[in-house]
Curated annotation (Swiss-Prot):
It comes from Sorangium cellulosum (strain So ce56). This is Cobalamin biosynthesis protein CobD. InterPro entries: Cobalamin_biosynth_CobD/CbiB (IPR004485). Converts cobyric acid to cobinamide by the addition of aminopropanol on the F carboxylic group. It is a multi-pass membrane protein. GO terms for cellular component: plasma membrane. GO terms for biological process: cobalamin biosynthetic process. Pathway: Cofactor biosynthesis; adenosylcobalamin biosynthesis. GO terms for molecular function: ABC-type vitamin B12 transporter activity; threonine-phosphate decarboxylase activity. It is found in: Cell membrane. It holds the Pfam family CobD_Cbib. Belongs to the CobD/CbiB family. The chain crosses the membrane at residues 55-75, 152-172, 200-220, 285-305. Keywords: Cell membrane, Cobalamin biosynthesis, Membrane, Transmembrane, Transmembrane helix.
Length: 314
């Protein structure tokens, strides 16, 4: 029961307060550790970089998972304290309010007619170069990022919390942070390869689960769920990432729009124009989808805690 309550406490804290200060934010600590390891990485030599990168991909997540396990063990005899602290420690592994607020930053700038400001705000959502994006492209990039990050920033960490507790959520967040910092082409091609592959593996189920949650939330909000499913099945595998395209394609279908990253992919069909109000609707669908998942996960954790899980799966 403590795990279910801690999950709900963490979600409530996120929606009410947002992100904790950087000094006490575990993801900031992860970033600092990764930055130090990047500086210590061997210079040159693919084999050396691959080996060092593989060690990074295991050492950093395992270290933070071990910290989570240690905290959980210390708190086990104290249920009330465990509830409060577990919720506070779980919160930094996901970021729903920050995701929504970043998207609203793009929307607000567009509503003010400030395309340059919207391009700057988009940098908080994704790593794409926004310098040449016009308003429709900024809307598309925002909608894509909100949909994709519904998985990375919310569903995935809570999925691993439900399976493995606080250590699971911290392990996932460390892997995802590694992928963000070194798991891309270019300078860190070989250093980040293991992190990128591990991130792909960990996100395989959550990304597809997120797409289904978006369809359910979209249906509840009166969006075109039938088209959402069709576009998910048709276009979900068109992105370079094996996972990112699933929630993005579902969202494209729900909103009846085409989401394009020029030179890379096109998801959905241009039935409706890319207007700035779609950022609001995408955020509403994502918030509803993630809250549905949080409620479902909490209910399952509570059921298992009360011993109902054994009866259900006997």
């Amino acid at each position: 029961m403590t795990a279910a309550a801690a999950l709900l406490v963490a979600v409530a804290f996120d929606l009410a307060c947002g992100e904790p200060p950087a000094a006490v934010h575990p993801v900031v600590w992860m970033g600092s550790a990764i930055q130090a390891l990047k500086r210590a990485a061997p210079a040159g030599g693919r084999a050396a970089e691959l080996l060092f990168g593989a060690l990074m991909a295991l050492a950093v997540p395992c270290f933070f998972a071990a910290l989570g396990a240690g905290v959980a063990a210390l708190l086990a005899p104290h249920p009330v304290l465990a509830l409060a602290l577990s919720g506070l420690l779980l919160k930094p592994t996901f970021a729903l309010r920050a995701l929504r607020d970043a998207a609203y930053g793009v929307r607000d700038a567009l509503e003010a007619g400030d395309v340059t400001g919207a391009r700057g705000a988009l940098r908080s959502l994704c790593s794409r170069d926004p310098s040449e994006l016009d308003e429709p492209a900024l809307v598309a990039a925002s909608v894509e990022s909100v949909a994709e990050n519904a998985s990375d920033s919310f569903v995935a960490p809570l999925f691993y919390f439900a399976l493995f507790g606080l250590p699971g959520a911290l392990f996932y967040r460390a892997v995802n942070t590694l992928d963000a910092m070194v798991g891309y082409h270019g300078r860190y091609e070989y250093l980040g390869k293991a992190s990128a592959r591990l991130d792909d593996a960990l996100n395989f189920v959550p990304a597809r689960l997120t797409a289904l949650l978006l369809l359910a939330a979209g249906w509840l909000r009166g969006a075109d769920a039938r088209r959402g499913l069709a576009v998910l099945l048709r276009d979900g595998g068109l992105t370079e990432s094996p996972n990112a395209g699933r929630p993005m394609a579902a969202m494209a279908g729900l909103l009846r729009v085409e989401l394009e990253k020029r030179g890379h992919y096109r998801l959905g069909d241009p039935v409706e124009p890319l207007r700035r109000g779609l950022i609001d609707e995408a955020c509403r669908i994502v918030v509803l989808a993630t809250l549905l998942f949080a409620g479902l996960a909490a209910a399952l954790l509570a059921a298992v805690s009360f011993g109902l899980g054994q009866e259900l799966f006997r």
